[in-house]
Amino acid sequence: MTDSIPKKPLKKGSLVFVDRGNYIKSIEALASDNDLPNYVFEGPGEILSVKDEYAQVRWRRPVPDVWFKLDQLKEYIQ
């Protein structure tokens, strides 16, 4: 039996950042630009929508919203 705290699911309104290790190993990284800007890895971005295993993320910059797999995102904690 483990005493770990259960992980909260990411949902609309959650603040997140992209986990560099999970993203680089993903098939999505192979199909995308391999030079993502640092702000996606530093956060925070806000989840606007969740569909199946993907989340639409908006950054606090004048850039388009982006879809990431939920397993590539981590909760942003200050």
From Swiss-Prot:
Transmembrane segments: none
Reaction(s) catalysed by this chain's protein: a plastoquinone + NADH + (n+1) H(+)(in) = a plastoquinol + NAD(+) + n H(+)(out); a plastoquinone + NADPH + (n+1) H(+)(in) = a plastoquinol + NADP(+) + n H(+)(out)
Keyword Secreted among record annotations: no
GO MF annotation terms: oxidoreductase activity, acting on NAD(P)H, quinone or similar compound as acceptor; quinone binding
Keyword annotations from UniProtKB, A to Z: Membrane, NAD, NADP, Plastoquinone, Quinone, Thylakoid, Translocase, Transport
Enzyme Commission number(s): 7.1.1.-
GO cellular component, one term: plasma membrane-derived thylakoid membrane
Stored Pfam families: NdhO
Broad class of where this protein is predominantly found: membrane
Keyword Membrane: yes
Entry membrane topology: Peripheral membrane protein
Enzyme class at the top of the EC tree: translocase
Localisation: Cellular thylakoid membrane
Quaternary assembly: NDH-1 can be composed of about 15 different subunits; different subcomplexes with different compositions have been identified which probably have different functions.
Role this protein plays: NDH-1 shuttles electrons from an unknown electron donor, via FMN and iron-sulfur (Fe-S) centers, to quinones in the respiratory and/or the photosynthetic chain. The immediate electron acceptor for the enzyme in this species is believed to be plastoquinone. Couples the redox reaction to proton translocation, and thus conserves the redox energy in a proton gradient. Cyanobacterial NDH-1 also plays a role in inorganic carbon-concentration.
Protein name listed in UniProt: NAD(P)H-quinone oxidoreductase subunit O
Organism name: Prochlorococcus marinus (strain MIT 9312)
Gene name, Swiss-Prot/TrEMBL: ndhO
